[in-house]
């Protein structure tokens, strides 16, 4: 049944992309990327990931002038993550930059919006990134500016110039990093869009030549009573198929796309009881008010009920297996998950992601 589902969606996507040509050949080695936060309570198993993005570093922009950047949280946590390379020398670790500010010695002084507006500040930031990579033996940089032309976390934004300047920033980063370092970004499920005051989001077509791959955040695409990370959903605001189709129509190679996997249930976006980590889900299964691992056949996703009402959707080993076959059938570059510490003590979802990426689907 899974194979029939995957093949049918594959045909639908292929048809929708005409006249863009045939699907790219599958890369031999797919990426299994874990986001690991500075505040997390566990480390990834370096033997069941290929890449780790350490989250986060933040910009220090004072009165619209870029000064430097620093890691969020304690450096000791970052050192622990970097030490994982001793257990797996092939492991790639990148530093992810956020638009938010959390360090006590910092404040919002313009952020990415102001820094990227200046050619001199862009180049200084790029040079600082290269120096940091060399100092720590990092493998690359990931930009998680969410999002150009928008502000929902108190950060500065300028819809008139942010999207254009984002492209210039990625260009300068690639020129500084060269081809020896990874450059990626956290991608929204849609391309740039026009607004009354300018544009929002990333100009994907303009940015893709500069990056090695895109971490497409195919989660939080809706909330209860709809599905947040469905492969296909006729009721959700967006779904995985729509996201991949959006990128493919812009000419993004399939092997540059990583599919995002949430390690949590999305209930709402109201700032109250918004998410439930997978490790909490495991504990809540003994609560008689909850029902977990219910299955929607169209969306190919599990969901939960609370007192017989739809509570939220999430991913589990079953849905990750379906997405794994889908990733291989389409020739995507792999997957990413947010985030490592939300998994249970047995690392159930991390192991499922590794199985989804490494399984031989040709047998």
Residue ranges, per PLM feature:
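Glycan-binding loop/region signatures in secreted carbohydrate-active enzymes
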Residues: 96-99, 103-110, 256-326, 346, ...
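Substrate-binding surface in catalytic domains of secreted glycosidases
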Residues: 33, 60-76, 148-288
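Bacterial N-terminal signal peptides
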Residues: 8-19
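Stable alpha-helical elements in mature extracytoplasmic
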Residues: 45-48, 77-81, 108-111, 121, ...
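Conserved, mostly hydrophobic/aromatic
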Residues: 52, 95, 143, 173, ...
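Short, well-ordered coil/turn segments that N-cap beta-strands
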Residues: 29-30, 89-93, 137-139, 179-181, ...
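Glycan-recognition patch characteristic of GH18 chitinases/ENGases
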Residues: 25-133, 232
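Positively charged n-region of N-terminal signal peptides that target proteins for export
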Residues: 1-5
